[in-house]
Amino acid sequence: MEFSLANLQPKERASFALRALYEAAGCRKYHMGRFEEYSLYQANRSFLSSEQVITFTDLDGRLLALKPDVTLSIAKTAQPAPGETLRYYYHENVYRPSAESHTFKEIAQMGLEMLGAVGEAQVQQAVGLAARSLEQLGAAWVLELSHMGYLFGLLDALAVPETARPALLDLLREKNAHELRAAAKAAGLDDAGADTLCALLTLCGGCEETLARAEAFCKNDRMRAAAAELRALTRSLSAGGGSVRLDLSLAGEMEYYNGLVFQGYLQGLPRPLLKGGRYDLLMQKFTPGADAIGFAVYLDELDRLSAPLPPVQQQKTDRVMLNVALPKGRLGDKVYGLLARIGYGCAEDYNATRKLVVENPEAGIRDFLVKPSDVAIYVEHGAADVGIVGKDILTEASADVYELLDTGLGRCRMCVAAPNDYQDDPSRPVRVATKFVNIAKNYYASIGRDIDIIKLNGSIELAPILGLSDVIVDIVETGTTLRENGLKVVTEFLPISARFIANKASYQFKHREVDR
């Protein structure tokens, strides 16, 4: 029987192509032949994509783990000599929680690491191999670059306290300008400083134009050095072609990443396929004075490329279509009315049809009518490019999306409410009725209060009236329902309004359509 590469799955074909690429670049294959002790992952848990790890007890009583990561093991065992650069690639399965199944999943991963003496040449080689890796995978691609030195330099220039930096970086990653400004003010920045930090979100786009603006924006030598490194790097990449973009709000974990960070996207996939960066701070935990840069490719994502597009999403026009998830109900009606007034309405009145998809090919818009609680899911998983969703739903789902705009629509607040005569008893857990389980847990954890959660799906106000709970956590708009049922607001802790969100991969390929 004749063997043909065409009979292989996409991830199998990719593994052959990437192996040939990495070996031609002088990389040796690294194989993890043993289980690591759980303590390795526990000590470096913020480097991992999830703190949840599968553990087991070995025959000698040691607590071991099924590997959630390969880079940590390579960094621990490599031990490069001074002046030496080690180059490894790997093809391993790692074990991580799946966002889709909410269970642990075996994930096929290939990656490349350069450790030891890592200078400009090694950085350019590593990022060049990342770009060439994307080229091997058979779809349009984007490689997105940023630099932690640029971010740290700006935070230094603005005198941002160390304790405030992780939260600000999280908001930068989300492109969440409205909450970033408030957090900056809370961290002690004045209006000018908050505006300067928010301006970082505008430093994204094509390399030449964005670099010119980034260089003009520099406040100190650290920022200028980072911009110079990015300019040299993009010049080396331009010779190889491809779609390379800068986004200086892209940030890695600040405890480990200190230089270049990057992500790679393939058209048709809802999340980054490739992630990498310079992690000298991690490497120096194991080998003082050594540096490191590397990346991982998530091969399982390629299986999605072989699935045919549903008919409703197949291109019927030369114009790029922006897929919008609209919530059914009053909020969706308001948003649709706004879109229609600026030329993005559809020929069919979506309130007068039972269709769930309506479109306007001339305007390049396609609307999906979705249950409000599902909007974030459709956007996160790439079924829709953008959507309008309440902050309550977005927070409850912890959706991995860009939160681009606070529309100001549907303003209300998340509150703790209780009977008018309620007195907290600190000697026992508070019984909390809510449909926002994660929001309630996180709020009470932030104040150090033990709770028992009672999940309900409606008529939440009834729970304390009948003694089912002590308090409720729910959305309050006017407070009329609470007052008419003998309840009062105890605490307001989360302002709610409708947010404009975007899928992170869609934003790379349709940023012009999203920004318009």
Q: Which stretches of residues belong to each language-model region?
A:
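Short, surface-exposed recognition loops or helix-turn segments adjacent to catalytic cores
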Residues: 140-152, 168, 245-251, 454-461
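TRNA-binding/sensing appendages of the translation machinery
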Residues: 1-64, 124, 128
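Beta-rich nucleic-acid/ligand-interaction surfaces
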Residues: 32-51, 146-156, 250-259, 461-468
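Glycine-rich, N-terminal phosphate-binding loop and its surrounding beta-alpha-beta segment
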Residues: 52-101, 375, 380-389
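Broad gene-expression machinery/nucleic-acid interaction feature
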Residues: 51-53, 63, 86-90, 107-111, ...
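Domain-level signature for soluble enzymes in the chorismate/prephenate branch of the shikimate pathway
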Residues: 317-516
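Acidic, His- and aromatic-enriched active-site or binding-groove loops in soluble protein domains
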Residues: 52-58, 160-182, 266
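Positively charged, Gly/Ser-enriched RNA/tRNA-binding surfaces
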Residues: 7-25, 36-37, 71-82, 89-139, ...
